[in-house]
């Protein structure tokens, strides 16, 4: 047995242990038909990413579950990997090239992609190394990348299958367009930011009725150039007579109709809505219903493309000039300040432009149905259950999914256009002959696929699909997905419908949802607020175990949590407590004789009590982990180690350890070692480093704690009678300590303790525990009796269950010194009361001071009055 260092130094042990785990391949999982599999797929972090608190929480939760199941004997696979992060990586590479004076266009597609791969080689593994620092026990031998050969093959396979089935099509629809990145982006990449803007109220003249206008209100007056109708509610009596009439569209030479559509809320605004089908998703739907023209007014860089005075202007410049022109024409009614949510690109913060574009889409109506049924039938469940409603809401209101992106980095769409006849061929490789015209001039589609398209296949593409591999057969479907509530729609739903469509099985049976890690004020961590906390900084200062414990303690599924540095310090203090207790136990084991012969009959009341406690803890923690109550499980382990084991049991057995003649010393050491081993195992999934270091030093024959058996509940360790008996002793000790604290008696001052009870069984409990009871209760002598005979009237008492504890007053307190101390305190309080009364009686103070200051002084007066009453009462008792 190696002796532990005097102080716990995480920086010294964590990297060393992680290297040992990697070399030992302890994280590796293989197909093993004699064992039950347990699989988690890691949500692949972006290769552009750096570890943040969200990653730290997400991966700590996954690691806890994997370590737990591994110890339970499952073949536990935690499948890791990274995401190519199309737009994020492309932006990073463009910026890097810009610094070198090179543009994306200069390099061309192939040259630019080479730069992207170089960037990935240089920076793509950074976040993986950071996950190592956290202690993540993922099977790094199996690490995948969304653009590796296998995953790319899966993407092509799915695209072609869905296209052939008629689920993938190319068409014009409204997309989120970023004018800076010049690509469509997913809803997931649109960040809605509240901005102060305006409602511009504009009059549209009614054709043929001079002086009659229809008033509309818009937050984007420049889109007027793309209006193809004005809509009113069919039940709105104000406008029934003009439905079907034409309006002059200001600033253009066009006329547009007034149409009736139930989309319009007649109670909102003027009850008239301008319809711009090419630049608003709701207007697009109205346009489809009424067969309206779709006029795209913007170029890809958000400059105006409509011939006329505004041609070539930026959208905001055009807005300014158009509003001024409307005002000159007398058509600008008013401008009303208006705060509203504006969609911005989360990468570059540019305002996103809804725009009709030719894009590739996935039809969602049919694919959504089995994903809905999976939840309703119980194949899939959410923890907490309430998030199932969010999942259903998204699926029941789902729109076709725009999967094309105007980027170069990513999976290129496998569509080839015949340059002679225009036919489209979708295939894994460029066709040699056009099936329609027989020519061989093809050009591949320039667009790439949405990043979510490949990550939707992650649970099965990482296991070898579309090939029928042993890994896929054994490890799929996976067991649990751990993720944040913010990507239920963007990732979870897409994995479910993709998994069912391609494999016939739901890709996981449970989705464990966690919330966000917020700052101490409850704000979301962000660069703009400057309130982000780097997990690596926490690890460097306090160790990975302290960070993991902080993130999990008190954390309930689905709820946001606040990060406090004080909690990290508490976690570090707990690690120190575990270390110091283990070191103390190991030092005593070293000095002891062989304890292998200890049997149950050698165990004392206290030994059986702590065994019953760790036994009950084992049952509770196992149940909590099975229900994904990670925070509750950790809190129970913490309470047991800190309170029951360290503060009580170790203190109970110290008299036995320090007494060479004590016949029960071997039993104490045997119990200490066994309980410590069991507690370390229960703590291991949460705090892997410190538990590994202690466990392997305590038992040099063991290679690692992570492959040891998870503790199981033992009926023979229930020890109910001994448990109840020891709880009685603890109750008595607490009562004694409370009395002594109230009387300011230091632990060094011993006093006789009388235990009075008519119950022989109670007296026997104290008889059997006399030595540690005396030690914990600071007793010079323990006297057990059935009545109060011989106990002075001045004795201080405390009532416990079936007994009364007495302590002679004179043994606790030096009466003369205590009277002197109380008189000094009385004098001090008289001064404070006089000062407080004077302040509150001063009219000037009461009339001019802030109310908070007056309330503070009133509270002081109340406190001093109570303290004075207690001092006087105590003096009266002593002077008797």
Residue ranges and their predicted role:
Residues 254-259, 446-476, 643, 647-650:
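Active-site-adjacent "gating/activation" loops or surface patches in catalytic cores
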Residues 2, 16, 20-24, 94-213, ...:
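Residue patterns forming the tRNA-binding/recognition surfaces of aminoacyl-tRNA synthetases
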Residues 67-75, 96-109, 129, 133-138, ...:
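Secondary-structure transition/capping motifs at alpha-helix termini
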Residues 30-93, 146, 155, 216-218, ...:
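N-terminal catalytic cores of NTP/NDP-binding nucleotidyl/phosphoryl-transfer enzymes
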Residues 1-53, 76, 333, 346, ...:
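Non-catalytic terminal extensions that flank enzyme cores
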Residues 55-57, 282-286, 494-502, 637:
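Alpha-helical support elements that line or immediately flank enzyme active sites
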Residues 201, 393-453, 457, 501-544, ...:
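Feature 926 captures the class I aminoacyl-tRNA synthetase adenylation module centered on the KMSKS loop
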Residues 33-35, 43-44, 79-90, 143-151, ...:
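Short, solvent-exposed turn/loop segments enriched in Gly/Ser/Thr/Pro and often Arg
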């Amino acid at each position: 047995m190696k002796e532990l260092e005097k102080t716990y130094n995480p920086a010294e042990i964590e990297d060393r242990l992680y290297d040992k785990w990697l070399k030992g391949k302890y994280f590796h999982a293989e197909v093993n038909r004699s064992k039950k599999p347990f699989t988690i797929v890691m949500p692949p972090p972006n290769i552009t990413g750096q570890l943040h608190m969200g990653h730290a929480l997400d991966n700590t939760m996954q690691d806890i579950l994997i370590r737990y199941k591994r110890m339970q004997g499952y073949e536990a696979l935690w499948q890791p990997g990274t995401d190519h992060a199309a737009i994020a990586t492309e932006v990073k590479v463009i910026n890097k090239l810009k610094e070198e004076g090179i543009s994306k266009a200069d390099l061309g597609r192939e040259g630019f992609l080479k730069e992207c791969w170089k960037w990935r080689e240089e920076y793509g593994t950074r976040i993986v190394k950071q996950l190592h620092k956290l202690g993540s026990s993922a099977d790094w031998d199996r690490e995948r990348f969304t653009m590796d050969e296998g995953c790319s093959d899966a993407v092509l396979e799915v695209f072609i299958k869905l296209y052939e089935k008629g689920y993938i099509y190319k068409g014009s629809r409204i997309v989120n367009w970023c004018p800076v990145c010049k690509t469509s982006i997913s809803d997931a990449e649109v960040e809605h930011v509240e901005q102060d803007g305006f409602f511009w109220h504009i009059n549209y003249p009614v054709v043929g009725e001079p002086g009659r206008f229809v008033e509309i209100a818009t937050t984007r007056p420049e889109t007027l150039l793309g209006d193809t109708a004005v809509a009113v509610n069919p039940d709105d009596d104000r406008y029934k007579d003009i439905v079907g009439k034409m309006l002059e569209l200001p600033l253009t030479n066009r006329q547009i109709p007034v149409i009736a559509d139930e989309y319009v809320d007649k109670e909102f605004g003027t009850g008239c809505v301008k319809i711009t089908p090419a630049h608003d998703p709701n207007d697009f739907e109205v346009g489809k219903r009424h067969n309206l023209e779709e006029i795209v007014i913007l170029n890809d860089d958000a400059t105006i493309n409509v011939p006329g005075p505004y041609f070539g202007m930026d959208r905001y410049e055009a807005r300014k000039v158009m509003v001024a022109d409307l005002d000159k024409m007398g058509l600008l009614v008013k401008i009303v300040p208006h705060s509203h949510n504006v969609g911005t690109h989360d990468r570059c913060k540019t305002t996103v432009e809804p725009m009709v574009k030719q894009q590739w889409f996935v039809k969602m109506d049919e694919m959504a149905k089995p994903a809905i049924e999976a939840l309703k039938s119980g194949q899939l469940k959410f923890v907490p259950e309430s998030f199932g409603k969010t999942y259903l809401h998204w699926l029941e209101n789902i729109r076709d999914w725009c999967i094309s992106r105007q980027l170069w980095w990513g999976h290129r769409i496998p569509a080839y256009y015949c340059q002679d006849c225009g036919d489209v061929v979708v295939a894994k490789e460029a066709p040699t002959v056009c099936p329609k015209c027989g020519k061989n001039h093809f050009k591949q589609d320039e667009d790439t696929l949405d990043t979510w398209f490949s990550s939707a296949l992650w649970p099965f593409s990482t296991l070898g699909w579309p090939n029928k591999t042993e890994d896929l057969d054994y490890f799929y479907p996976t067991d649990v997905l751990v993720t944040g509530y913010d990507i239920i729609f963007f990732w979870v739903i897409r994995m479910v419908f993709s998994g069912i469509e391609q494999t016939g099985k739901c890709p996981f049976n449970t989705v464990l949802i966690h919330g966000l890690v917020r700052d101490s004020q409850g704000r979301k961590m962000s660069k703009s607020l400057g309130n982000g906390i780097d997990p690596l900084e926490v690890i460097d200062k306090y160790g990975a175990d302290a960070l993991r414990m902080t993130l999990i303690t008190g954390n309930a599924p689905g709820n946001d949590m606040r990060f406090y540095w004080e909690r990290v310090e508490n976690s570090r203090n707990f690690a120190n407590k575990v270390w110091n207790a283990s070191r103390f136990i190991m030092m005593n084991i070293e000095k002891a004789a062989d304890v292998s012969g200890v049997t149950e009959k050698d165990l004392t009341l206290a030994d059986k009590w702590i065994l019953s406690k760790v036994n009950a803890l084992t049952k509770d923690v196992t149940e909590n982990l099975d229900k994904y109550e990670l925070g509750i499980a950790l809190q129970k382990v913490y309470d047991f180690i800190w309170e029951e084991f360290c503060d009580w049991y170790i203190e109970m057995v110290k008299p036995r350890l320090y007494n060479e003649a004590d016949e029960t010393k071997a039993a104490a050491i045997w119990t200490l070692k066994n309980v410590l081993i069991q507690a370390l195992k229960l703590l291991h999934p949460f705090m892997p480093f410190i538990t590994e270091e202690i466990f392997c030093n305590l038992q040099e024959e063991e290679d690692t704690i992570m492959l040891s058996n998870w503790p199981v509940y033992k009926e023979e360790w229930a020890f109910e009678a001994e448990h109840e008996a020891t709880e009685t002793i603890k109750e008595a000790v607490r009562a004694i300590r409370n009395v002594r604290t109230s009387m300011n008696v230091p632990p060094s001052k011993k006093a006789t303790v009388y235990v009075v009870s008519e119950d022989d069984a109670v007296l026997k409990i104290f008889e059997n525990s006399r030595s540690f009871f005396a030690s914990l209760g600071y007793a010079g002598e323990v006297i057990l009796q059935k009545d109060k005979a011989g106990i002075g009237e001045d004795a201080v008492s405390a009532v416990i269950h079936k007994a009364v504890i007495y302590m002679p007053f004179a043994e606790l307190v030096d009466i003369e010194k205590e009277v002197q101390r109380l008189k000094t305190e009385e004098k001090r309080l008289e001064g404070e009361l006089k000062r407080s009364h004077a302040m509150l009686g001063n009219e000037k103070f009461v009339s001019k001071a802030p109310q908070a200051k007056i309330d503070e002084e009133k509270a002081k007066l109340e406190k001093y009055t109570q303290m004075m009453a207690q001092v006087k009462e105590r003096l009266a008792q002593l002077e008797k």
